[in-house]
């Protein structure tokens, strides 16, 4: 299994629709101002956060249960900047829609710009033949409110291709998050 380069990422996005919308270069400015970068990098793709958020609140519940998650634990927010309360988290989704090839697995890591501010981005791997918008989790580990910027970079996806095709893909298993379009809450 080897990591894939910018040339491979561009080819797969442009010829096979692996990432839509796709930015073939690294974007660092918008309207003359510096932003958190996004687009193709040497061995990865920096994804952007859309403007749809679900901000965690503890007002309506007393326990967090991944098997029986209460939707009322979140406040919906739409905007260019999301403020995450201290020691809390928010869910969002990518602007990009992904179609992962059968021989590919991705690993997604948060960008250091956010990590250096105490904001951790968590995303699980994109499995072979998974497709959809990616649900992102932003944890604010600080005792202060933290900003997340929609339309800017938030994490980097690394693509690994196996030299052998998997026997059963995410699509074959009927994965519960296949084809997700909005911010998707936990499912069992």
Curated annotation (Swiss-Prot):
CDD domains: trimeric_dUTPase (cd07557). PANTHER family: DCTP DEAMINASE. It comes from the Bacteria. GO terms for molecular function: dCTP deaminase activity; nucleotide binding. This is dCTP deaminase. The active site is at residue 137. Catalyzes the deamination of dCTP to dUTP. Homotrimer. One of its GO terms (biological process) is dUTP biosynthetic process. Belongs to the dCTP deaminase family. Pathway: Pyrimidine metabolism; dUMP biosynthesis; dUMP from dCTP (dUTP route): step 1/2. Its EC number is 3.5.4.13. It catalyses: dCTP + H2O + H(+) = dUTP + NH4(+). It is an enzyme of class 3 (hydrolase). HAMAP family: dCTP_deaminase (MF_00146). The keyword rRNA processing does not apply.
């Amino acid at each position: 299994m080897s990591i894939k380069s910018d040339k491979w990422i561009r080819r797969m996005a442009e010829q096979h629709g692996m990432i839509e919308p796709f930015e073939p270069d690294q974007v660092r400015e918008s309207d003359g101002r510096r932003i958190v970068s996004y687009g193709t990098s040497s061995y990865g793709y920096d994804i952007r956060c859309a403007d749809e958020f679900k901000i965690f609140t503890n007002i309506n519940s007393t326990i967090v249960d991944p098997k029986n998650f209460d939707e009322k634990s979140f406040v919906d927010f739409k905007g260019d900047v999301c403020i995450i309360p201290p020691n809390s988290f928010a869910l969002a989704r990518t602007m990009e829609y992904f179609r992962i090839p059968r021989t590919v697995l991705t690993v997604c890591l948060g960008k250091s710009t956010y990590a250096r501010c105490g904001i951790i981005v968590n995303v699980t791997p994109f499995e072979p033949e998974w497709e959809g918008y990616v649900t992102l989790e932003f944890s604010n580990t600080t005792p202060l409110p933290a900003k997340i910027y929609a339309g800017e970079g938030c994490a980097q996806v690394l693509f690994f291709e196996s030299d052998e095709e998997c026997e059963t893909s995410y699509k074959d298993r009927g994965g519960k998050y296949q084809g997700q379009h909005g911010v998707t809450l936990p499912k069992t």
